[in-house]
Amino acid sequence: MRVINFNAGPAGLPLPALERARDELIDFQGSGMSVMEHSHRGREYEGVHDEAISLLTRLLGIPDTHQVLFLTGGASQQFAQVPMNFLRPGASADYLMTGVWSEKAFDEAKYYGTPRVAVSTARPDKRYTRVPRQDELRLESSAAYVHLTSNNTIFGTQWHTFPDVGNVPLVADMSSDFLWKGFDVSRFGLIYAGAQKNLGPSGVTLVVADKAFIARGRTDIPKIFRYTTHAENNSLYNTPPTLAIYLVRNVLAWIQSVGGLAQLEQWNREKAALLYGAVDRHPEFYRAPVERESRSVMNVVFQLPTEALDASFVADAKQQGMVGLKGHRTAGGIRVSMYNAVSVENVRTLAAFMDHFVKTRG
């Protein structure tokens, strides 16, 4: 029996994607080999690789100006790879500080140039409860790029409208909310996302890059770290994480089969309404620190009156078959991660549990 998985990542995968992998694990398409045993330059794997790119391109409406890349190293590598490619000594880039992960990206940029904090919504206690307003941004037109983190898993905030950054390329870490809904890819110079939330398993990092933007990248860095190297070689410059990309393909095929990103957005908004509804019904018991306009659809955070009640909530939920609810060590409390593989019914079950928990423990 499978549990209801609210882990923040690696997160649950859609059951049809896992079942497809199970059925094809030993003998992939009659080849007598597992997909993970095939050469990354062989016909069998090439079909998977190209299908994954094609599915994502269609689902998201990626224009010809942009290219899909499959890399490794996670978002943490991208924190360094972005400035490595686009910052030069003496140059600056603007960073929008909205949480721990944007702080980490900012720190990596210091090795290559002069990152600048264009805005920070950190409170005196170093917590974040909102994303900034457009009028709070202090952007420089000479910046090499503007970097933001679209969703903040630890503190539960999310950009619901991306900022206007003028003619400066916008770079976004979308690791924790990529594909929760559709959006205009053409607005971005580069998007990166670790796969292990909404897209697949850990081990592969998705990049969607503006071809003209990455063409301006530095050439005095190792080839393996140049975006152009991977673009020119269809993400096959070195051996890619073939099994992870195969599972990404399965997840993308599932998204297409259920109705695409419009259907996912509908489900995700319904899930958020259910869970925040349970929180807001009991505001003295479930204390949600995030300002309403900045509430994340993917990661809902709240605290109970005491740490002991937090622990009881997690333990009781586990007995009911729900796991992954303990908050990040930085924030404490409870964190509910509702990525695409979490169903509306899963969240309805948790919301009912929350109402019952208040009655018995409140």
Swiss-Prot record:
Binds 1 pyridoxal phosphate per subunit. The modification N6-(pyridoxal phosphate)lysine is found at K197. It catalyses: O-phospho-L-serine + 2-oxoglutarate = 3-phosphooxypyruvate + L-glutamate; 4-(phosphooxy)-L-threonine + 2-oxoglutarate = (R)-3-hydroxy-2-oxo-4-phosphooxybutanoate + L-glutamate. One of its GO terms (cellular component) is cytoplasm. Its main location: cytoplasm. Keywords: Amino-acid biosynthesis, Aminotransferase, Cytoplasm, Pyridoxal phosphate, Pyridoxine biosynthesis, Serine biosynthesis, Transferase. Its cofactor is pyridoxal 5'-phosphate. The keyword Transmembrane does not apply. Signal peptide: none annotated. One of its GO terms (molecular function) is O-phospho-L-serine:2-oxoglutarate aminotransferase activity. Homodimer. HAMAP family: SerC_aminotrans_5. Belongs to the class-V pyridoxal-phosphate-dependent aminotransferase family. SerC subfamily. This is Phosphoserine aminotransferase.
